[in-house]
């Protein structure tokens, strides 16, 4: 069995996972209840709940408390072709109805983080992991 003590700092878990539903409206979204101030975030999945089978571009990225930020995009076109590329948003989703949602981390906060929506064209669920 692996030693899992590295996952805790001072007896408290140093990673936390969750998901957040983002509305189609502009603005910032504060996510709280993490239990610590994160120093990094990883978006591990996106889901367009209004059009669940039509995502053609999905990007999940990461950001640390410094300047490192990147996402990897997977494009799935209607002809079945799949392409990959990279971008600079923390998250990015584009569907077949031409709706786009993208955004970045605004701040790491005492009990979570705040996302800022660059474009908010659809309701989007994002799945994330944060750590310290």
What is each stretch, according to the model?
Residues 15-17, 110-113:
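Short, hydrophobic/aromatic-rich segments at coil-to-beta transitions
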Residues 1-19, 23, 129-132:
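Enriched but not universal
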Residues 65-108:
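Contiguous ligand/interfacial binding patches
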């Amino acid at each position: 069995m692996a030693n899992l003590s590295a996952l805790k700092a001072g007896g408290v878990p140093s990673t936390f996972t969750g998901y957040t539903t983002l509305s189609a409206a502009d603005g910032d979204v504060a996510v709280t209840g993490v239990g610590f101030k994160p120093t990094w975030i990883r978006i591990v999945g996106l889901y367009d709940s209004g059009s669940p089978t039509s995502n053609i571009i999905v990007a999940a990225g990461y950001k640390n408390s410094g300047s490192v930020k990147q996402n990897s995009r997977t494009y799935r076109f209607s002809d079945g072709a799949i392409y990959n590329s990279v971008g600079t948003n923390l998250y990015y989703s584009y569907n077949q109805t031409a709706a786009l949602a993208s955004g970045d981390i605004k701040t790491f906060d005492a009990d979570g983080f705040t996302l800022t929506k660059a474009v908010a064209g659809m309701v989007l669920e994002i799945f994330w992991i944060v750590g310290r």
